[in-house]
């Protein structure tokens, strides 16, 4: 019986891992489709597509799946008619949250989000109810280990028009985030890519006008559970924020 139970546990864990991997692949595929539709379907001519493909390869999305997603972007299949939608709401502890979603069904996505916010004691808000607490900015992220000189990166970024460069994380998880205006995003991204190749992330994002430290262990746990539920929802490609999400307290 013990052996049978252990085998069942292994199957359960593998099933959970496979399900999580499938969700990640789904998100990556959506991002590739949106990126391919945002410009030329050729990575060399489309920085956003190049970044999406790099992210997909980092997660070991098979090459044939990547190529199929790019090809799908050129078709008219209803299931692949994804659009980018921004939602706003209050999460645990009245933290202001901006969520960026890729969806082919607005009603379904809004319903899923409303359920997640409500489940964690939050509330999905109307358009404009939260966004004023944030600045809409361009964001380019590099792993620190891929940059030889922070000063050289800083000097190049500022010469291209970046307004800030932030550090986050430690060790192999340390990253540099270059912040710029929406208007200068293309110039900053392309200039950085020309010097340092493609980064970990390059897209428009939301930055809080005022940072609030979450120093309550209980609230931190609630926030992490809330964000995990958001990330587990297959209708999202990426959460806006400090390299995935910025939270602005109120």
UniProtKB/Swiss-Prot annotation:
Residues 1-22 are annotated as: Disordered. GO terms for cellular component: cytoplasm. InterPro entries: Integrase-like_N (IPR017856), TACO1_YebC-like_2nd/3rd_dom (IPR048300), TACO1_YebC_N (IPR049083), Transcrip_reg_TACO1-like (IPR002876), Transcrip_reg_TACO1-like_dom3 (IPR026564), YebC-like (IPR029072). GO terms for biological process: regulation of DNA-templated transcription. The keyword Cytoplasm applies. It is found in: Cytoplasm. It holds the Pfam family TACO1_YebC_N. Keywords: Cytoplasm, DNA-binding, Transcription, Transcription regulation. One of its GO terms (molecular function) is DNA binding. Belongs to the TACO1 family. PANTHER family: PTHR12532:SF11, TRANSLATIONAL ACTIVATOR OF CYTOCHROME C OXIDASE 1. This is Probable transcriptional regulatory protein AM694.
